[in-house]
From Swiss-Prot:
Peptidoglycan polymerase that is essential for cell division. It comes from Hahella chejuensis (strain KCTC 2396). This is Probable peptidoglycan glycosyltransferase FtsW. The gene is ftsW. It is found in: Cell inner membrane. Pathway: Cell wall biogenesis; peptidoglycan biosynthesis.
Length: 397
């Protein structure tokens, strides 16, 4: 494993960080800062009279995310394991609080944010990480029950259904899909019987399909997705403008800062559709770079989780799988929406899009994966050294 080893001088504790994981995350964050600045300059100047308004806010959120990441790196994964019930309460607490009038903040018809003055906290961003950690803890504590009985298999799904209900009340269908994919993926990776997983998968797909057509605005988005040009000035407007951005970018792009679509043509150019601006300004080559960096990030996330599983650190492994699936699922959906492969959904691109809660939580997830990788390496080293200690003891006798 390509790694960077850090040593704390006071207690001589070492921490080994996975370099490809860390490097890909830093590269995505740096590109995100540049592209958010480029995509938001004209919008910020028109809305606030300050061209760099969103750049400074994004940089502040990024630094806050790095600070949170440093704290998370110092926390043993055992702490998360012990606090799993508390984290579930926190998740449910945020999802309930955002629905209380006067606490939740409504934007574009959705009540997803809790306003704390200078920052708006998106409840679903916190809830999905807490739920992934709780699910990892449950799988470790009840692994035989999950694998051996329908009731043990159903228990975490009941918690997921409660969270899903609260997310639908906001509504936040995108966060629901990402969270559901992560939890279902964690259950599959725990070794559950294939027949049960197939039944669960069919239930989830059916539920998502039913929810997608149950509300007029979701159905409208779905029909617009199939043929956005049929209603390019209404329901298909956002997607057609994104596709125009991709078409203008061609191979190498129109150049950094030279996007036309960000000039009030493409809504949410610095948030949900920043990838379309990347494609326009940096072209196909720049878009592929983003995809490759996400591929490296997700590969290393799954890799360090697998190493933890081989080292017998099951909670670390399942938590790593869950966090990686959260990042990967959200990135995949965002890229699919931007390219017209999936219906339009309000999800940010992790580590790149503007958004305080999303950026900080993404940094937290990366820090958790780095900590998992560090503990996994320590576990492997302990296993390798233990026979040698035993042999030395025998020689002394």
């Amino acid at each position: 494993m390509s790694a960077l080893t850090l040593t704390a001088s006071k207690n001589t504790q070492t921490m080994t960080l996975d370099l490809p994981l860390l490097g890909s995350a830093l590269a995505l964050a740096a590109i995100g800062l540049i592209m958010v600045t480029s995509a938001s300059v004209d919008f910020a100047d028109d809305a606030n009279g300050q061209a760099l308004y969103y750049m400074w806010r994004h940089l502040t959120y990024l630094l806050a995310g790095v600070a949170v990441g440093f704290v998370i790196l110092r926390l043993p994964l055992e702490w998360w394991h012990k606090q799993s019930w508390l984290l579930l309460v926190v998740a449910l607490g945020f999802l309930v609080a955002v629905l209380i009038p006067g606490i939740g903040r409504t934007v574009n018809g959705s009540t997803r944010w809790i306003s704390l003055g200078v920052i708006n906290i998106q409840a679903s961003e916190i809830a999905k990480v807490c739920l992934a950690i709780y699910t990892a803890s449950y799988l470790v504590r009840r692994l035989d029950e999950v694998r051996g009985s329908w009731w043990g298999f159903a228990k975490p799904l009941l918690v997921l259904m409660l969270v899903a209900l609260l997310l639908l009340m906001e509504p936040d269908f995108g966060a629901l899909v990402v969270t559901m994919c992560a939890v279902v993926g964690m259950i599959f990776l725990s070794g559950v019987a294939l027949s049960r997983f197939a039944a669960l998968l069919m239930f989830c797909v059916g539920s998502v399909a039913l929810l997608a057509v149950s509300q007029p605005y979701r159905l409208k988005r779905l029909t617009a997705y199939t043929d956005p040009w049929a209603d390019q000035f209404d329901s298909g407007y956002q997607l057609t403008q994104a596709l125009i951005a991709f078409g203008r970018g061609e191979w190498s792009g129109v150049g950094l800062g030279n996007s036309v679509q960000k000039l009030f043509y493409l809504p949410e150019a610095h948030t949900d559709f920043v990838f379309a601006i990347i494609a326009e300004e940096l072209g196909l080559l720049g878009s592929l770079l983003i995809i490759v960096l996400f591929g490296v990030l997700l590969w290393r996330g799954m890799y360090v989780s697998r190493v933890a599983e081989r080292a017998g650190q099951l909670f670390n492994a399942y938590a790593g799988y869950g966090v990686t699936l959260l990042l990967g699922g959200q990135a995949l959906i965002n890229l699919g929406v931007n390219t017209g492969l999936l219906p339009t959904k309000g999800l940010t691109l992790p580590l790149i899009s503007y958004g305080g809660s999303s950026l900080i939580i993404s940094c937290l997830c990366v820090a958790i994966l780095l900590r998992i990788g560090s503990e996994a390496v320590s576990g492997e080293q302990t296993e390798d050294e233990s026979p040698k200690v035993k042999n030395r003891g025998g020689a002394q006798r």
